[in-house]
Amino acid sequence: MAPRSVRSMVGTSKKDMLKGGFYETVRIPLCIYRLIGILPISGLWYRSSKYNRFSLKSFYTIIYAPTIVMQTFLLLVHIYDLFAFFFGHQRLGRLIYHMNFYTITILIFTGSRKWENVIKEIETIELTLPRLRNSKKALALTKSFVFAFFVFSLAEVVLILQFTLRLTKQRHVLPGDSGLYLKSYFVYIFPYLYDHFPFSYVMGFIVQIIKVQGIITLNMVNCIVVLLSIYLTNRLKHYNRIVFAKGSKTKNTRPKWIELNLLYTKISNLVKIIDKHLNPFVFISFTANLSYICAQLFYILNKLTSSRTVKITSFLEDKRSDWETLLYISLSFALVVLKVLLVSIIAAEVHTTSREPLRLLYTLPTTEYTIETQRLMTQVYYSNLSLSGLNFFHITRGMLLGMVATLLTYEIVLLQI
């Protein structure tokens, strides 16, 4: 006889089966993408995915089309600026940051065109899986993470604005020139633009909006990775509860191992399908965050290690640095490190949870060890269920330790230069 969780699928409506599912998990972040002008999918305000449509023939195109055009223009400006002034780490950093934002925007556009097929493929599998327990609790957790990442994005915007406005006032605005404050700010924060084009307030405001879009976009990518990691972990935990419940069943009511094997195969397919469509975003998320961490480490250690000696006082007395610079760099560095650790730890739980059934399978009595249990054991052991970055790396606890070790090695090398 099938386990109760499997039998409960019978007579359950499609709406109930999809509660706490893939679409409900990612719907709110996608709505945010829609609002900031980079996602051409309509119908996201509905709780059902059947209303989702990719369309450029709508009022929304008035927002989306200029956004893409402006991003493309800024990418070309960044590339020209980099070669016109013979490179430089600041120009290279700005180019890498904008390329990450631009790449995500293009990936979102191409993904939007296939969205209806993707959501149909995923929900087809979800309808064959046992209904998730505590779906309301899972959705509440999802909303909490979305809120936290959105607040983090706004905090990052405010922190950058406060820092750049302060530096503009200190370095680029002379006494009696308060009327040129806004112009000085735009020239200081967007040198790659006004070194090659005449000054324009309109252009400055547009580029500032694009910059805010980039901050929110990159943070929401991290948010989506976290949310889908939680969703897949919940799916695997629910499966693990079914498997471990087998040990407490009597012989006549125990589920057949072949059913558990088939169920694990379905969940494996779900993980692999989601990873196939998500892994470019995972790759961009990690490369963007790690490149920023390395750049900040280089800047901090370069300032602190004059004459191969760490002198914080000299760092603070530098005419181009003050305590606000140190505070800004330290806060931004700490926030990005915390964000990377949060994303990595939660995403690594997918792989860790997928290995849990082995604890039971390795301790089965001889009477229970059959060809089906052996097949399930082999499948669990060799199935690398985890999120990946374009299959270049898989997010596991081992990968997290390796990443930390690499950053520490990078820091030691910088200290020795």
Language model segments and positions:
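Generic structural signal for well-ordered, non-membrane alpha-helices
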Residues: 74, 100, 120-127, 234-241, ...
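Helix-loop-helix junctions within predominantly alpha-helical proteins
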Residues: 62, 68-92, 97, 129-221, ...
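Short, contiguous, pocket-lining structural segments
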Residues: 201-212, 216-235, 252-259, 279-282, ...
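Terminal membrane-anchoring module of integral membrane proteins
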Residues: 2-67, 143-153, 157-162, 253-417
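Membrane-cytosol interface segments
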Residues: 2, 17-18, 22-31, 97-120
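Short intracellular "coupling" helices and adjacent cytoplasmic loop segments at the cytosolic face
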Residues: 107-112, 131, 135, 244-257, ...
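Inner-leaflet juxtamembrane helices
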Residues: 105-126, 226-236, 337-364
